[in-house]
Design a protein with these regions (language model features):
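Glycine-rich beta-strand-to-loop/alpha-helix junction loops that act as flexible
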Residues: 38-40, 96-98, 248
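Glycine/serine-rich anion-binding loops at beta->alpha junctions
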Residues: 90-106, 139-145, 280-281
């Protein structure tokens, strides 16, 4: 087990009916004016937004609204949110939604007081120092952004997608009511399941295997999510399965399953190029295409063999590496996830473009058991075609 630091300050309010406490929670922490941030309108149609405003009103917390945040959020939208929060005198950004809404709020929070462009932070021209607090009302189990230190934005002017990892990104509190996820479309639920799995699967495929405690925590999380995923897709109103997915989403990406490991989220890097190229590609759907190909790439070279064998046996109950990879594909397939780049309309030419973008035309290499440069990334994308 390698040395590590782990700091998870986000307070969770978990369970049925917790969203009704948002006013009490915000007022109890001294907030006086919240900016409610949300996405495409489901929060309005479901009545959730009205319930949140009623709760804030009852506790004397003033509020404004910033809606229309899209999937695969943009730096431009983030800058508009920061400007509006500054204009309205907001002292809390309240993100109502999933990863896209939360990530936009996180990055906007760094810009409200400083007036900086959010891209300054993703490009490390500045470090977050004076950030507005962020609270979350979570509506989908997926990214784990409600407790993570990361946020991802796309610059529409350049088509570049970048992330920022910073302890300043961790929300102050997160309200997590599994019942809010029961009306999600099946495809969106399935994309979330893949995303939850991937945050731990990538960390599990580490280059230092001597970390039995974190291995077993990871295996327990993954097998629990696999089981809960099957249950939820068969019965969307299964509360216990929904609760398992929602909590697992946080645990999978708050740093716990990477503690003491040497690992990188390189399959995520490859997927980011896909959704940067076409923002209609859901992150989880893209990962469902990349991950089996990523594993196959290493298996063909006889690399990560012990890890891949353990992955096959402990996660999928398979005796061979090939069996584990196929079981992964079959699980994703059972939810209707895409299997190939062509399922998104992406071509070999697109794969070449993404390979060059991902590695900055070969100038960038990702550290792994085999360093991943331009040629390696090309091959992984080719296995996705």
């Amino acid at each position: 087990m390698l040395n590590f630091e782990l700091y998870i300050p986000t307070k969770l309010y978990f369970g049925r009916g917790q969203c009704g406490r948002v006013g009490e929670i915000a007022a109890g922490r001294g907030f006086r004016r919240a900016l409610i941030c949300y996405g495409g309108g489901s929060a309005v149609r479901s009545g959730l937004l009205e319930r949140i405003k009623t709760s804030l009103d009852a506790s004397g917390v003033e509020h404004d609204e910033f809606g229309g945040i899209q999937a695969n959020p943009t730096a431009e939208c983030c800058a508009r949110m920061a400007g509006f929060a500054r204009e309205r005198g907001s002292d809390l950004l309240l993100a109502v939604g999933g990863g896209s809404v939360i990530d936009t709020a996180k990055m906007a929070a760094h810009c409200v007081r400083t007036g900086r462009d959010p891209w300054d932070y993703t490009e490390h021209r500045a470090e977050p120092t004076d950030s507005l607090p962020v609270g979350v009302v979570l509506t989908i189990a997926a990214t784990g952004s409600e407790t993570s230190d990361s946020a991802v934005l796309t610059n529409t002017a350049t088509g570049v997608k970048r992330g920022l990892s910073s302890e300043k990104n961790r929300p102050l509190f997160a309200i997590m009511d599994p019942e809010l996820t029961m009306t999600l479309p099946p495809y969106q639920t399935a994309c979330g399941i893949v995303d939850i799995l991937m945050h731990t699967m990538e960390r599990y495929m580490c280059t230092n295997p001597d970390n039995e405690l974190i291995d077993r925590i990871s295996e327990g999380l993954l097998t629990s999510v696999i089981d809960a995923g099957r249950r939820v897709m068969a019965e969307p109103a299964d509360y216990e399965a929904r609760a398992t997915l929602m909590l697992a989403g946080s645990l999978s990406h708050n740093g716990l399953t990477g503690a003491g490991r040497a690992c990188g989220l390189w399959a995520h890097k490859l997927e980011h190029e896909m959704s940067a190229l076409d923002d209609r590609i859901a992150h989880g759907a893209g990962l469902a295409v990349v991950w089996p190909a990523y594993l196959e790439f290493f298996a063909r070279r006889g690399l990560f063999t012990e890890r891949l064998e353990r992955y096959a046996e402990k996660i999928w109950g398979e005796r061979t590496v090939e069996g584990g990879i196929e079981a992964t594909r079959e699980y994703f397939r059972s939810f209707g996830m895409p299997e190939r780049l062509s399922d998104f309309g992406l071509t070999a030419e697109d794969a070449e473009y993404m390979s060059c973008r991902c590695t900055d035309d070969g100038k960038k290499t990702f550290p792994s058991v085999l360093p991943l440069g331009l040629e390696e990334v090309r091959e992984i994308y080719s296995l996705c075609l």
